[in-house]
């Protein structure tokens, strides 16, 4: 543990004082963690993993191993106790695992089959096809949020640099910014950059650039309400803590959860926190699609027509107010399935 923490800190070019300030932990404690004279708590381990970009599973295994050795390492019955504990842990793990509904599992199985087919035809990938689908994604994602530009107008703004008569400057910026944000998440995917607070804030900064420059890439400082929803986002003083928990949840589940469900969960959790004054929906969908791209899937394009938008909002509302995410997970899985089917049909497979 001590070597893992020290090496990770030095690789990040941080001093113990800087780590302490960023995490709100006493500098003396950081030094003790690295010397091995003090063990961090679970919460401190999770925060250190997020800040120092250490794989959470790796550091948690080391932490638990040292915790076990400290408690029973020298006891004559240690091995026997571990064997009994292993069986109990296996049993509890089986009991605690949530069973997916048949409908959701069937869609995930269909997605797996479509992805296998897609992977076998990667050679047919076309820049022009990708460009066209990304254009559609920008159009639909902005349409969900009330942007009135048509698909053709969106194309003219992005690819021809034209100004559309009768459309506001904000609508033009929303189109340009979203397209640049897509390019940004594709770059993150290609570089295999881990998802963390810095990258989420960077995505949001692109979305609001030139629209709300003072709020772009910053958590909100005021309370907000979501029009048409009974869900009340957390108070502004809670946002930073909620976002810490958001990234801890991601690190804890990123290696064990189905990628479609992981992406959908991150989408729902981020938009429920509503950490920004504006641009929460677009940012949440981009984070979701970054996760999908990182796992070899394609962008799940949620349509902005009235029927699709209402289905999307209702599924979110149910997740936020009734603590039932089934409809939302089904909705996102269906969107990815339809996106895969369309992509395969375009390349003629």
PLM-predicted stretches and their roles:
Residues 3-22:
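Short basic helix-loop element that most often maps to the first helix and adjoining turn
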Residues 24-39:
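Recognition helix of helix-turn-helix/homeodomain-like DNA-binding domains
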Residues 66-76, 86-349:
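FIC/Doc superfamily catalytic core
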Residues 5, 19-20, 30-33, 59:
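Conserved hydrophobic/aromatic packing and binding residues within compact polymer-binding modules
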Residues 43-58:
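DNA major-groove recognition helix of helix-turn-helix/homeodomain DNA-binding modules
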Residues 5, 16, 27, 42-45:
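Helix-turn-helix DNA-binding elements, focusing on the entry/boundary residues of the two helices
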């Amino acid at each position: 543990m001590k070597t893992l923490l020290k090496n990770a800190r030095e690789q990040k070019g941080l001093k113990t004082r800087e780590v302490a300030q960023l995490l709100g932990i006493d500098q003396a404690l950081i030094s003790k963690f690295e010397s091995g004279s003090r063990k961090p708590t679970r919460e401190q381990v999770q925060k250190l993993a997020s800040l120092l970009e250490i794989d959470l599973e790796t550091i948690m295994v080391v932490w638990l191993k040292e915790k076990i050795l400290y408690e029973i390492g020298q006891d004559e019955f240690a091995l026997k106790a571990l064997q009994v504990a292993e069986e109990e842990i296996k049993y509890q793990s089986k009991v605690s695992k949530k069973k997916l509904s048949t409908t959701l599992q069937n869609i995930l199985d269909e997605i797996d089959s479509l992805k296998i087919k897609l992977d076998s035809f990667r050679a047919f990938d076309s820049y022009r096809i990708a460009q066209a689908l990304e254009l559609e994604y920008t159009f639909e994602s902005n349409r969900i949020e009330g942007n009135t530009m048509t698909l053709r107008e969106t194309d003219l703004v992005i690819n021809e640099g034209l100004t559309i008569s009768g459309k506001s400057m904000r609508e033009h910026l929303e189109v340009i910014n979203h397209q640049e944000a897509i390019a940004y998440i594709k770059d993150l995917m290609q570089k295999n950059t881990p998802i963390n607070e810095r990258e989420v804030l960077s995505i949001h900064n692109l979305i609001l650039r030139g629209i709300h420059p003072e709020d772009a890439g910053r958590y909100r400082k005021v309370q907000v309400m979501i029009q048409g929803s009974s869900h009340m986002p957390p108070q502004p003083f809670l946002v930073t803590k909620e976002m810490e928990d958001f990234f801890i949840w991601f690190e804890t589940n990123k290696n064990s959860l189905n990628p479609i469900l992981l992406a959908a969960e991150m989408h729902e959790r981020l938009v429920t926190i509503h950490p920004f004054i504006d641009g929460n929906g677009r940012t949440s969908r981009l984070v979701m699609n970054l996760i999908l791209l990182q796992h070899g899937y394609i962008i799940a394009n949620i349509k902005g027509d009235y029927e699709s938008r209402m289905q999307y909002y209702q599924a979110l509302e149910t997740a936020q107010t009734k603590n039932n995410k089934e409809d939302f997970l089904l909705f996102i899985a269906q969107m990815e399935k339809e996106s895969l089917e369309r992509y395969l049909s375009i390349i003629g497979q």
